[in-house]
Design a protein with these regions (language model features):
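Subset of outer-membrane beta-barrel
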Residues: 1-265
């Protein structure tokens, strides 16, 4: 199959310089064992912007006769970090911190990861950026993902998932969600983020409560929406909420004359 995903992430709606993210990814299998992918990413917050693109390669190994497989992946990416201070208004003119109006830096980086999976379970770990960079504070992040899908009835399945993120000098945080999947077409459920030090979401760790919902519009097209509301005090009248929209195209191949079922992960 070939899959194309388009994502838009918006935070602090109606605030100038609010965080925004756009992402595009394309992946396909060249054979039963080899897959390749391409992704592009644009992230902006205030005067800072990060634009990157990457090429991914994956090799899949079949571990047993029960469809347990291991995917090993490598990533090569180019990242342009930009800082434009020309629109910043300061209290005092001539502030030395703002003498350099623009700053740009291009970095080449590499990533690696693995993905262990079967039709009902997955476990993965990845490091998107192996090389750290000081000027724009690019740190090495470790990601761990774990999830599965459980059949409750012919029309209902539950899909719990966990994402753990570890960065040096920052609290280890995790995102947790559980979806209800109805008729292999609709899904919805709660999600939240917290840190290992704070079991419940807290503003300090960027915690939030949220919800996610989606639908397969057709066998090849799905649409998802996620809402996140941060915890803690709201300051300066800013509504610290996040909206995320995902559009996914799946061009499914035929195997022995039978169309494969929609992918849930």
């Amino acid at each position: 199959y070939t899959q194309l995903s388009i994502l838009n992430h918006s935070q602090w709606i109606n605030i100038d310089g609010a965080p925004e993210t756009q992402a595009l990814s394309l992946g396909t299998k060249l054979s039963e064992k080899i897959g390749i992918g391409f992704s592009a990413f644009n992230d902006r917050i205030g005067p800072a912007r990060n634009t990157s693109s990457s090429v991914d390669f994956a090799y899949h190994l079949k571990l047993n006769e029960k469809n347990l497989k291991l995917g090993l992946g490598l990533k090569m990416s180019g990242r342009l970090n930009s800082l434009d201070l020309s629109g910043i208004r300061t209290v005092q003119s001539g502030d030395n911190s703002f003498l350099v109006q623009t700053q740009n830096e291009l970095n080449l980086n590499f990533g690696a990861g693995f993905y262990l999976y079967n039709p009902k379970f997955y476990l993965g770990m990845g490091i998107p950026f192996l090389i750290e960079e000081d000027t724009f504070n690019i740190q090495r992040n470790f990601y761990l993902v774990l999830g599965g899908i459980f059949k409750i009835s012919d029309n209902l399945q539950l899909k719990p998932s966990l994402l753990v993120q570890k960065t040096a000098e920052i609290e280890t945080i995790y995102d947790n969600s559980i979806w209800a999947v109805v008729n292999d077409r609709f899904w919805f459920g709660p999600q939240y983020r917290a840190s290992l030090k704070n079991v419940l979401p807290s503003q300090k760790a960027g915690g939030y409560f949220g919800a996610i919902a989606g639908v397969y519009i057709s066998k090849n097209l799905s649409l998802g929406y996620a809402y996140q509301g941060a915890t803690g005090n709201q300051r300066l009248g800013i509504t610290n909420t996040t909206h995320e929209i995902l559009l996914r195209f799946q061009f499914l191949s035929k195997y022995r004359g039978v169309l494969r079922s929609p992918r849930l992960f």
